[in-house]
Amino acid sequence: MDPALLRDRELFKKRALTTPAVEKRPSASSESSKKKRAKLELSSTSGSKPSSDGSNGSFNLKSLSGSSGYKFGVLAKIVNYMKTRHQRGDTYPLTLEEILDETQHLDIGIKQKQWLMSEALVNNPKIEIIDGKYAFKPKYNLKDKKALLRLLDKHDQRGLGGILLEDIEEGLPNAQKAIKALGDQIVFVTRPDKKKILFYNDKSCQFTVDEEFQKLWRSVPVDSMDDEKIEEYLKRQGISSMQESGPKKIIPVQKRKKATSQRRRFKTHNDHLAGVLKDYTDVASGKP
């Protein structure tokens, strides 16, 4: 190669290394186009997800049509609706068509209807069938405040304690109004988990206790003792518990079965040759 050309090549390399390279800033139009592309991608991905109702945040069941989630979503809506109408006082049963009409689910398929009729509503513990129609089945079916007071009184007499407020609200139409009307005939107790329990207020048990007896009662330390130790101590003092003084269940004595006598079976050999074989024991014993 020509040495002049080699010299020129080396000089060009040196100049290229010494000159600083500056990158151009991206134009505003290119940045805006990138942002638009990102927005389009986000909108396309969000459009593929199941739609939800923006007004109340509830999930759109129709987007899951044909899936198990859609079926169970319809079932949950039906049960909640039946509970709400029972609490309003509408306790009469409805047909499936009436329920679907009131819950705005008349457009469900035949398979879903068949599943609701033959399996879902029949086996649901909160739904009962009355003459081919469906009604809500609460834990305590109460008609009015008198029925509530009788139930609380029965629980008190049997030593069952109180009843959860949510169970009463579930089964008693217009429960808050009835509870307010009962006034001091019932007592509220709030548990550590913030759930309220209703008790019957037995006014016959309201009496003044002597102050001296109260002091004696409060002076007995029982913090370090569990229920078993307290029960043992009371037994040693000759005080029996209510369980021991109450009626005891008599356990029926089971009759012994007579032992059946079974004959012992001995093994027998060569029964099929009984007429052919001969016994030579006497002959063998006669030999010297």
Curated annotation (Swiss-Prot):
Keywords: DNA-binding, Nucleus, Transcription, Transcription regulation. Transmembrane segments: none annotated. Residues 41-56 have a biased composition (Low complexity). Residues 16-56 are annotated as: Disordered. Residues 63-143 bind DNA. GO terms for molecular function: DNA binding; TFIIH-class transcription factor complex binding. Tetramer of two alpha and two beta chains. Belongs to the TFIIE beta subunit family. This is General transcription factor IIE subunit 2. It comes from Xenopus laevis (African clawed frog).
